[in-house]
Amino acid sequence: MSILSALTSISNPMKSTKSSVANGGGRLSMGTNSVACGSCGGGNSSSGTINNADGSQTTYYSYTSPVYTYNYSYSYSSSGSSSCGCH
């Protein structure tokens, strides 16, 4: 009788300056500090903004079905797995 153990190795997140996300069997690479996500349904367009200290605004994401584009760096594990937060 044996006991099978699954060991999960978790390493420190690494900062990404060029984002890529899994896209089916391949990988979808975008420009620096952006990430493309698959469709979350609907045909809407939206965007999110940050209010800067000087009163200006910075758009940090935009959505036009079926692609989200995020305008910031994000961290991911060394395994390269990441998700786009479509719920």
Swiss-Prot record:
Q: What InterPro entries does this protein map onto?
A: HssA/B-like_chaperone, HssA/B-related
In which residue ranges is the amino acid composition biased (Polar residues)? 1-22
Say which domain of life the source belongs to.
Answer: Eukaryota
Return the annotated region ranges for Disordered.
1-23
Q: Name one GO biological process term.
A: sorocarp development
Which PANTHER family does the protein's record reference? HSSA/B-LIKE PROTEIN 1-RELATED-RELATED (PTHR31059), HSSA_B-LIKE PROTEIN 1-RELATED (PTHR31059:SF5)
Report the sequence similarity comment from the record.
Belongs to the hssA/B family.
Q: Which named protein is this?
A: HssA/B-like protein 7
Q: Which gene encodes it?
A: hssl7
